């Protein structure tokens, strides 16, 4: 980039005297800038015309001229970034920000957070990694799941922290008395992000394509067919009642993209840039629900600013400003909460590991100090003895007389807190005469894991979305973990039980049915929760409407900036 090259050359001119006037020859300047004498004369002339410096040459070859500086490279960089942002050249601004972490922190601070840019309220969020491409179906990353919920709409949606679905692309729906026909009434004022009117037939095409994905096919296995029964009505015909259907359609994995343009949605924000170093969202002017109060949101991908280890943590802090709380006086903790999501441990029963041995392992975890003495940052996790509030783990008598197997195999995936948990468990079991072989699956889910079949113990994390009970039902149906963990008859029985629970029209009856399933799994020592996460959001003053959601993010449609004072 031309601007960055000019800035780097200016830095080379400036550096030896740190801005003091220099007596120097043209050949010395050319060597410093790694260019010819002719080119350095052009550089000096351009910089002088821009008002950056003054050059008084002396006649005669090899004579020393006088070089006087008028601006520092830092102030130039700031001015260039400001100009790039004003002209909508975010990529150029980010390219100018190629500095060491501490210098970058100082440079970016004025640009991040909430700003009015060309009368447009814009929120800039530094983020620790590039975002994976959005696609239909399940996404492993919390940030991608959150983003999909803002770019795409579903027939239904969850609003705020509510666990009951409400209308989205469909304003209402009706269910037949036998639970086998669901009519979704589609709004007449819908538009894609490209400005085209949304046709109900397009929604049917997108839904049909979604249901061809293996994981989504499991989720919607009760759906027999989808028909356009009126220009403003989609009808789902089921072969067995499924009173979770509106919940299934409200989750991020069921959001609908344009059938021919997979990155075009109809949500409150549209993607205008999706690159490894920059993601920019702009508000959708024809959005069918309450319009966002911000016009643009940008993720600036700046991994050098973040602790690498925290990057794959179960609680990466969502901060809309650079710096730690003690580094920036004006940065404040806006919202914090204990997640409903949890890290878990599951045990596969086999001739090598029986139920009593599995129970003793769970007792070791919960009755010892193991969970409470993990060497992790204070406030990062909270050890738990319940799967969801009120879903307590069973209490068993002292099982220290139960002999553990001589060897066991543990496999686990991210978050990184489970590295620590695995190491602690390995050391503790060694003291009990059990050698633990540890395998790390470097991913956020079990998808594609070839070593699950080898494991006796598995550890992972379960993100809980907007409807906790439904989220756990979805987990049992779709996660690759369960067919490996349970025998074929056990897994078939589990799926049949889930089918029976979903036929209950009464929500409380469905919740009770799911609680009974998990209570039995916990009683049989198949699963136990380990700890919950602590989510937090920090933001500078003037960024309002920030409230944590169930994914540890905040609703982009509710954030707002006060108008700048004249």
Name what the model sees in each region.
Residues 19-22, 41-43, 140-142, 172-215:
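Aromatic- and charge-enriched surface segment that lines or borders ligand/interaction sites
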Residues 66, 216-261, 266-278:
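Surface-exposed binding/hinge segments that line
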Residues 126-175:
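N-terminal lobe/hinge region of extracytoplasmic solute-binding protein
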Residues 282-285, 335-360, 373:
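A bilobed periplasmic-binding-protein/Venus flytrap-type ligand-binding module shared by bacterial periplasmic
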Residues 286-327:
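Ligand-site clamp/hinge motif
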Residues 350-392, 520-526:
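Periplasmic-binding protein-like
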Residues 474-540:
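Extracytoplasmic/peripheral linker and loop segments enriched in polar/acidic and small residues
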Residues 539-566:
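Long beta-strand-rich cores associated with HINT superfamily self-processing modules
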